[in-house]
UniProtKB/Swiss-Prot annotation:
InterPro entries: DM_DNA-bd, DM_DNA-bd_sf, DMA, DMRT, UBA-like_sf
Composition bias, Pro residues: 108-124
Compositionally biased residues, Basic and acidic residues: 172-181, 218-228
Keywords of the record: Developmental protein, Differentiation, DNA-binding, Metal-binding, Nucleus, Sexual differentiation, Transcription, Transcription regulation, Zinc
Localization per Swiss-Prot or TrEMBL: Nucleus
This protein's name: Doublesex and mab-3 related transcription factor 3
Free-text tissue specificity from the UniProt record: Expressed in the spinal cord, in a small population of neurons located in the ventral horn and around the central canal.
Gene3D superfamilies to which the protein is assigned, alphabetical: DM DNA-binding domain
Region called Disordered, residue ranges: 89-130, 157-228, 415-474
PROSITE patterns to which the protein is assigned, alphabetical: DM_1 (PS40000), DM_2 (PS50809)
One Gene Ontology term, aspect cellular component: nucleus
Other information: DMRT3 is a marker for a subset of spinal cord neurons (dI6).
Statement: the UniProt record of this protein carries the keyword Coiled coil: no
Protein encoded by which gene: DMRT3
């Protein structure tokens, strides 16, 4: 035990010294190791003492290096050739495959197999066969490679085991088979539409030559490609519409809507599509649900009491509970018709018999007696928080223009209590200078009402319908 270190190896070091991290393994020269010498490999190849040795172990190392170099060159050449033959001319302008340098780096390198000590002559023909196969595959044209891959949806069962490429086939790892059997790869092989310009990856391209010798008939018994699944079914409240998959290929949604609903006007279809935010499925659901407006109108006209105003504040819940609950927006009813809950019965003398059913001049002779309490958030109850209804679609702008309502609420209380709603910004009442509500009944004396707003408050508010809609929606 001196200051220069102990010649012995102690397993347990002192407690105060932290344990050292294991050093990274540095590569050593294999030929020198065969002869019992440890040499660092970096910068050693030119000066190795055993570089010209022809013993059995050194020849085995030479042959192993040749086989690995031939495999790497073969895989690189296969990737380049198969990609050039697989990409059609229509997809050449799209973003191309990664460069072959990245492809060779991404391809998994075969691990060095530990072979027993044996004479090299059986190893030499395998390397020559691999190089000859690479040259043969590079020179042969492959016109049917694309058709063979398009006709096979299941790629995992189409591996060939030729004797010439046996050692090449064994070197592919499990990552390639998982990547080939994934549904995304099957989809990109199955249809080369402009919506799916996925280029075949490099690892799959290496298999194009091997799959070329297999059978190229399509597989109708595959569970993913049944004949009845060539159409996309969209369900609505009044029926279903089947969309063929050919409509989805590089076609704008407005054209698809014109194909499905030829009896609708293009402007109406465009408005519905804009209202749905460009979502084709939501627009189809809106158009499907608008078909049921006639039957809903007949059902509503059979009920004389179509507008019921309960006093507990839950407005229209009894009529809206019959709608089906769906999570998609605008799935029930059309935005271009009056909701069924707001249709007035036809036996009243002052109702125009048109689809909008707008009252003429005075549907309510005294609005303070019969307040129309409309909410913009009718679906915000705990039982069904996402209940779609027509009142939320048919916004309060039309109601404000027709019924001259300032906001969501007209106060049913007399004008002698203005301080009740004075501080509430959500419940403003309108000024009483409207000639509509100044017509009293014959038996009711006219009572002068106190104005709830001063002129300054009234001037500060904006009278545009857009700002009122923003206020009510907030």
């Amino acid at each position: 035990m001196n200051g220069y270190g102990s010649p012995y190896l102690y397993m347990g070091g002192p407690v105060s010294q932290p344990p050292r991290a294991p050093l990274q393994r540095t590569p050593k020269c294999a030929r020198c190791r065969n002869h019992g010498v440890l040499s660092w490999l970096k910068g050693h190849k030119r000066y190795c003492r055993f570089k010209d040795c022809t013993c059995e172990k050194c020849i085995l190392i030479i042959e192993r290096q040749r086989v690995m170099a031939a495999q790497v060159a073969l895989r690189r050449q296969q990737a380049n050739e198969s990609l050039e033959s697989l990409i059609p001319d229509s997809l050449r302008a799209l973003p191309g495959p990664p460069p072959p340098g990245d492809a060779a780096a991404a391809a998994p390198q075969p691990p060095p197999t530990s072979q027993p000590s044996q004479p090299p002559p059986p190893q030499r023909p395998a390397a020559e066969l691999a190089a000859a196969a690479a040259l043969r595959w590079a020179t042969e044209p492959q016109p049917g490679a694309l058709q063979a891959q398009l006709a096979k949806p299941d790629l995992t069962e189409e591996r060939l085991g030729d004797g010439s490429s046996a050692d090449n086939t064994e070197t592919f790892s499990d990552k390639d088979t998982d990547q080939r059997s994934s549904p995304d790869v099957v989809k990109s092989k199955g249809c080369f539409t402009p919506e799916s310009p996925e280029v075949v990856s490099v690892d799959e391209g290496g298999y194009a030559v091997q799959k070329n010798g297999g059978t190229s008939e399509s597989r109708p018994d595959s569970p993913k490609y049944h004949g009845e699944q060539n159409h996309l079914l969209i369900e609505g409240p009044s029926g279903t519409v089947s969309l063929p998959f050919s409509l989805k290929a590089n076609r704008p949604p407005l054209e698809v809507l014109k194909k499905i609903f030829p009896n609708q006007k293009p402007t109406v279809l465009e408005l519905i599509l804009k209202g749905c935010g460009g979502d084709l499925v939501s627009a189809v659901e809106v158009l499907l649900s608008s078909r049921s407006s006639a039957s809903a109108a007949d059902r509503t006209s059979a009920e004389p009491e179509s507008l019921v105003l309960p006093s507990n504040g839950h407005i229209f819940e009894h009529t809206l509970s019959s709608y089906p609950i769906s999570s998609s927006k605008w799935s029930v009813g059309s935005a271009f018709r009056v909701p069924d809950t707001l249709r007035f019965s036809a036996d009243s003398s002052n109702v125009v018999p048109n689809p909008l059913a707008v009252p003429l001049q005075h549907p309510f002779p005294q609005p303070p007696r019969y307040p129309l309490m409309l909410r913009n958030t009718l679906a915000r109850n705990q039982s069904s928080p996402f209940l779609p209804n027509d009142v939320t679609l048919w916004n309060t702008m039309t109601l404000q223009q027709q019924y001259q309502l300032r906001s969501q609420y007209v106060s049913p209380f007399p004008g002698s209590s203005p301080s009740v709603f004075r501080s509430s910004p959500v419940l403003p009442t309108r000024a009483p200078e409207d000639p509509r509500i100044s017509i009293p009944d014959d038996g009711c004396p006219i009572v002068s009402k106190q104005s709830l707003y001063t002129e300054d408050d009234y001037d500060e508010r904006s009278d545009s319908s857009d700002s009122r809609i923003l206020n009510t929606s907030s």
